[in-house]
Amino acid sequence: MPVLEEKKTADHFHHIGVLGAGSWGTALAAVASYKGAVTLWGRKREIIDAINQRHINPDYLPDIIIPRTIHATDELNDLSSASALLVAIPAQKMRSVLRQIPNDSRPLILCAKGIEAESGLLMSQLAADIFPHRPIAVLSGPTFASEVARHLPTAVTLAAKEKDIRAALMQRLAIPTFRPYASSDVIGADVGGAVKNVLAIACGVVAGAKLGNNARAAVISRGFAEMNRFGIALGAKEETLTGLSGLGDLVLTCSSELSRNFTFGKKLGEGYSYEEQQKKRAVTTEGVFTAPVLQRVANKLKVEMPLVSAICDLIEGKSVNSVLERLLSRPLKGEYSISV
């Protein structure tokens, strides 16, 4: 007889493990600590000690007191008793970390936004490549880590194919200031977070080059059209792309200098090259890595993404004026599928 799996409930996920002690991982650990035990894993010993002894993360969230109930560690084995793992590792380091954890049945909730440069895989595709039989979820939406950690109101998409796991994780992570909305569209939730990183750079360029509010609105709306085309080509649902993890995240990161991608783009628009910025930046700007691989995957899918292509040109050193001229001289067309 087949063995019936136990239906998952919020109590089943009492102990949450968080991979990544950067700003986002630390903020998520603070959320998860509201209803249960949390073990937070990171690489830097000095950060681990600061969290455990002084209850701060001096490198990433220096002004925020971290709940005392969070236990930080630099040993992956300390996560062995956790019943679910939130993964907040930068996209380009995701594979190397996932390969170090056991291949078991504990759900992985992917919280990073991006596309692996070498493979062209979204985070959920990458995780499924390593763990083909493991439950995979995506948590994504309009979130600045500092605001989540300060318990300002936040809503996110939590996507998983397994209904009971999705429902249990929502109950476990929901707190008065952090509200997950359910989705079964894992790819759709993943696409939005990856593409918006690149489009946020574009909006930053508009701000830095002082191209005006009209141009920023055009980038957001036409950028969303590119996100929509790309997502649908990968099998995403349009309703997911218009939700928190797609349009919601796009609007947030295209409108604030709290976004690292927006700030990077603003500096590009002001005339600072990619190389000049890299010398000064200690944190990951995921959109820089995502842009060229996103363009490559889009070309393979025959999806037109002119704004993404423009950002690739700017990162490679082309001037804002030349890239803008190319964008505005493209053949006139209908806004959607209507012919001119």
From Swiss-Prot:
Its EC number is 1.1.1.94. It catalyses: sn-glycerol 3-phosphate + NAD(+) = dihydroxyacetone phosphate + NADH + H(+); sn-glycerol 3-phosphate + NADP(+) = dihydroxyacetone phosphate + NADPH + H(+). The keyword Cytoplasm applies. It comes from the Bacteria. SUPFAM superfamilies: 6-phosphogluconate dehydrogenase C-terminal domain-like (SSF48179), NAD(P)-binding Rossmann-fold domains (SSF51735). Catalyzes the reduction of the glycolytic intermediate dihydroxyacetone phosphate (DHAP) to sn-glycerol 3-phosphate (G3P), the key precursor for phospholipid synthesis. One of its GO terms (biological process) is glycerol-3-phosphate catabolic process. GO terms for molecular function: glycerol-3-phosphate dehydrogenase [NAD(P)+] activity; NAD binding. It is found in: Cytoplasm. The active site is at 196 (proton acceptor). Pathway: Membrane lipid metabolism; glycerophospholipid metabolism. The keyword NADP applies. Belongs to the NAD-dependent glycerol-3-phosphate dehydrogenase family. This is Glycerol-3-phosphate dehydrogenase [NAD(P)+]. Pfam families: NAD_Gly3P_dh_C, NAD_Gly3P_dh_N. Keywords: Cytoplasm, Lipid biosynthesis, Lipid metabolism, NAD, NADP, Nucleotide-binding, Oxidoreductase, Phospholipid biosynthesis, Phospholipid metabolism. InterPro entries: 6-PGluconate_DH-like_C_sf, 6PGD_dom2, G3P_DH_NAD-dep, G3P_DH_NAD-dep_C, G3P_DH_NAD-dep_N, NAD(P)-bd_dom_sf. The gene is gpsA. Its main location: cytoplasm. Sn-glycerol 3-phosphate binds at residues 113, 141, 143, 196, 249, 259-261. One of its GO terms (cellular component) is cytosol. PANTHER family: GLYCEROL-3-PHOSPHATE DEHYDROGENASE, GLYCEROL-3-PHOSPHATE DEHYDROGENASE [NAD(+)] 2, CHLOROPLASTIC. Gene3D superfamilies: N-(1-d-carboxylethyl)-l-norvaline Dehydrogenase, domain 2, NAD(P)-binding Rossmann-like Domain. PROSITE patterns: NAD_G3PDH.
